[in-house]
Each structure stands twice: as C-alpha cells, then as structure tokens.
Amino acid sequence: MKLGIINGWDEASFRYVAELGLHAVEFCCNHNYDSMEVAGHTDEIKAFGERYGVAVGSIGRWGQKRIDEQGEIIPSALRHDQNLIDAASALGCPVYNVGCNWTEGKTFEENCEIAIRYFGTLIDYAKGKNVRIAVYNCSWENFVVTEKEWTPILGALPDLGLKYDTSHCLGRGGDYLREMVAWGSRIYHFHIKGSLYVDGRHYDDPPAGLDQINWGTVMTVLYNSHYNGMLSIEPHSNHWMGTRGQWGVEYTIKFITPLIMPEDYTYNGSPYMP
C-alpha cells in the first residue's frame, strides 16, 4: 500500500506532496471543474510527477449529475468522465472514481439498471487503457453507496470496484468493518478520513488518528483483503485549517505510516505460533 493525499494538479501541489514525504497524489476534478483542466495538461502534469517523485494514484469526479430526469445518460457528463479516464491512462493512474445519481420516478430496480448501463459504458471505454472504474460510497450525486446497491450493480459488473471511505458508512449508521470484510476484494481505492460522532450526531471530521475510526482494524481488513492500492488522506474539517490543519495532516502521516508494511520488507520464514 502507498500513502498519499488529495491535492491539486499544479506544480506547487506536487511540490507540497513531496515535501510531506509522500509519493502519491489524488485529483478530485469535481463537477465544478472542466475535465480538460486535467485532461488537457497531462504532459505537464506527468512532468511534475517525474520531477518530484509523486505518482497520480487516483482521479475522481464527485458531484456530477450524470443521468437526466428521463433516466438517460447526459452526453456532456459522459464526455467529462471519458476525458478523465484518458487523463488517468496518460498519467499511469490506475483508478477512476465516479458515482451515479438517482432518477426520481424510477424504481430501485430501474435505477440500478441505469447505473449498470452507465458504469458499464465507462468500463468498456477504459478497456485497454489500464484504468479501473470504481464507484465512490459518498452520496454526492450518487445512490450506489451501500450493500443494497452494490449487490445488484457490482454483481452485474464484475470489473466495477469501490472507492471506500469509512466515514460515509459511519454517517449512515452502518458497520464499516462488516462492509469492508464483505466487499474488501472489490475495493480499488481507499480514503483516510477521520470522523467523529457524539451522541449519534456528526461532530467533526478531524485528522485520522484523532477520530473514532479503528484504523488498526481497518488496516487488518485491507491486508486480509489483499488490498495494495493507494491510501489517500482527505483533510475534511473547517475546525482543522491553517497551522493546526497542516499539523493535523502531518500527524495523520506519522500515525498511518507505521501501519503500512514497507514494500521492500523481507523475512525468511514465518513467526512461531504454538
């Protein structure tokens, strides 16, 4: 596994990530950005990565409405996703994260079929580009967020994976460890985002390690699921900005790093067990 962080795609962002001692960055080219801001500058972005030793580990587009009121694919939304899949391919980025919005007036089964059609279109487009498609478990213009939706949709699309974030499951009152154990083999990308609930209410998303997520157990499930992708730090709190926010990012790096087995770690044999 490789620890990285969400950040921008300009040179200053790559420099910042490298100064943190990290070697991977995630781009969130959300609905409020034109996809060509990334897709139109891949040569430049690739040069930044080589200069600072930082790989692009994930690209995603959150908040994009992809399906219209009739349940049809919105062509411009599809084009944005295709542009970013092309960008991921050009940058050597292994995963692209998407969602699919709910269509009012359609049944659950019909919405699942719409999502299968949309995700299937992206999977077909990504073939031969070394990019895998993952659906995020955030509900921002996306209804494919729990096992109820994953069972029919991922069941129909064996190449579709998950971008998993424990905080979203916690926010829905779910059991993130149960979800991870059941679906760990389908996790293509993973967010490191702290979350804290008090008396059943959301209190804050503090830096990971200063929150209530059991990160050691989370890592055990990822290891047992043979996950070997990016662990992407997501700062996500207005209480943790400025100097304290930066300290929080650095704290999370120091907290998570010892949980990651080094890539060059070797041992001849196996620990004794009676």
Predicted regions and their residues:
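Catalytic-core regions built around general acid/base machinery
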Residues: 41-52, 117-126, 179, 217-222
